[in-house]
């Protein structure tokens, strides 16, 4: 056994429906401002303010049916339904007609955001 200064995080995985297998979550890539109607709701213009990309920790992935605690110091804990695409294997410079062959499967995700904190940071020019 290795002698870690800090214990490494447990491997995050999700159950693959109708099997006994699990899908390991290595990285979480996200796209923000990718739905025009929602961008407008958030005060952005879809033709001017382009989508952006960010990552999230695999530890943010929790199993379906898990309890989510309402965080302290927020008055606006906002939910959004997300389309989750599980990548089966990677690559680079993938031709559009081959892209679907890299997808393992799809799922629904629930993105929870402290919207009041997000807006406050955005107004001060900070990343959220």
Task: Report the location of each language-model feature.
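Catalytic-core "active-site belt" of small-molecule-metabolizing enzymes
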Residues: 1-128
């Amino acid at each position: 056994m290795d002698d870690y200064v800090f214990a490494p995080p447990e491997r995050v995985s999700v159950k693959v429906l109708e099997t006994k297998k699990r899908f390991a979550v290595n990285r979480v890539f996200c796209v923000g401002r990718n739905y025009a109607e929602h961008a407008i709701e958030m005060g952005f213009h879809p033709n001017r303010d382009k989508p952006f990309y960010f990552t999230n920790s695999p530890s943010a992935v929790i199993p379906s049916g898990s309890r989510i605690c309402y965080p302290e110091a927020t008055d606006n804990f906002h939910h959004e339904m997300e389309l989750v695409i599980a990548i089966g294997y990677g690559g680079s410079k993938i031709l559009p007609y081959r892209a679907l062959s890299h997808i393992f499967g799809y799922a629904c995700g629930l993105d929870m955001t402290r919207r009041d904190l997000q807006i406050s940071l955005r107004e001060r020019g900070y990343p959220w």
